[in-house]
Amino acid sequence: MKSCPKCGQQAQDDVQICTQCGHKFDSRQALYRKSTDEDIQTNNIKMRKMVPWAIGFFILILIIILFFLLRNFNSPEAQTKILVNAIENNDKQKVATLLSTKDNKVDSEEAKVYINYIKDEVGLKQFVSDLKNTVHKLNKSKTSVASYIQTRSGQNILRVSKNGTRYIFFDNMSFTAPTKQPIVKPKEKTKYEFKSGGKKKMVIAEANKVTPIGNFIPGTYRIPAMKSTENGDFAGHLKFDFRQSNSETVDVTEDFEEANITVTLKGDTKLNDSSKKVTINDREMAFSSSKTYGPYPQNKDITISASGKAKGKTFTTQTKTIKASDLKYNTEITLNFDSEDIEDYVEKKEKEENSLKNKLIEFFAGYSLANNAAFNQSDFDFVSSYIKKGSSFYDDVKKRVSKGSLMMISSPQIIDAEKHGDKITATVRLVNENGKQVDKEYELEQGPQDRLQLIKTSEK
């Protein structure tokens, strides 16, 4: 369609004269317009052919850009740079993320210790150089899959390993810190509470038993902790240093606000050593001059006393209180017995025992003769007066005499004797019919006019 330049009437392209006003159209314009339309159509065809090529070229450019972007973040060199930057910038959270594994969660505090350990024991410049060289060699190698970065002293501090690929093209490098188990060995059952792997942790260790408290990456640690024993609760730290271990474990040094008590006794020479006890905060324990008692919290007073026996009687010291302000890591205390009181009692009891022993010597001398006569004559009456009638021992000896199985005895010696009311226990050493010495324990009863009779016996 075209418009008449004179009246504006619309007309077909091939019309020569306007039907409205009779204006004669210029045929050259129609030819020009036709030629132009054909050119436009030709150009459109060319453009349509070029579009797929342009799209393909654009996609290729995008792929190349994407490859370089992926390489910048996923190549072994890029992975190495991420770890190096985190260590250089003390980014403990990033280091913790990079070193954490499914089996061992590393928290930011461990990572902080690890960063400092690398800088102290390897040196940052040397570490970066060693790491880059190790990654380069592993990346080029067709056989090696792992290698270690070491400290100046030769301890492994970082394991670098190949772990598959990233996006087909790039080796995936895995960075893992080797671990060790810190171990405790408390003197008594102890509960430890501290933070590890970003979580609160509790470890219960039995007395004198080696107990691991977890797995830790290399470092010099001073971990805030609480510990609890029968003696109380303690605040302090668990300390351990990887430099001090060449094995899979590292010893823990406990650093708590605690007091250990050394006890010295005076006036105790007459007391039986096995009977001596120390009571600290109402807890009684055997005494030893070489033993250290505790630990006890330094923020609470301690009460302490001692006891011991002499000739069956218990003697005690006065109870002393050690103020919390006077408690030190090693605290010494002296407890005094009333030595005069003990000596007077021992002297009195020894006189009584000597008198009792003399009576028993006389009694058992007669008893052994009567026992042997009853055996030789097969007559229980010889020995019956030495044994209390109605006792199980009375019936037993009578039966043995009738069966001829009574044992002959001789040379009785009184080893020990104690009297409690009308009952006497005596340890007697005898020679049996085979000529062998045997120790027997007898129980006797003292009746009217101090008459002694046996009621029980047993071999010691």
Curated annotation (Swiss-Prot):
Cellular component, GO, one term: plasma membrane
Function description: Plays a major role in decreasing resistance to glycopeptide antibiotics.
Keywords from the UniProt entry: Antibiotic resistance, Cell membrane, Membrane, Metal-binding, Transmembrane, Transmembrane helix, Zinc, Zinc-finger
Organism: Staphylococcus aureus (strain MRSA252)
Name of this chain's protein: Membrane-associated protein TcaA
GO molecular function, one term: zinc ion binding
Subcellular location(s) of the protein: Cell membrane
Stretch list, region Disordered: 439-460
Principal localisation: membrane
Domain of life: Bacteria
Pfam families per the UniProt record, alphabetical: TcaA_2nd, TcaA_3rd_4th, TcaA_5th
Extracellular side: 71-460
GO process terms (BP): response to antibiotic
Family, as annotated: Belongs to the TcaA family.
Gene name tied to this protein: tcaA
Transmembrane annotation, as ranges: 50-70
Cytoplasmic compartment residues: 1-49
C4-type zinc finger span: 4-21
Membrane association type: Single-pass membrane protein
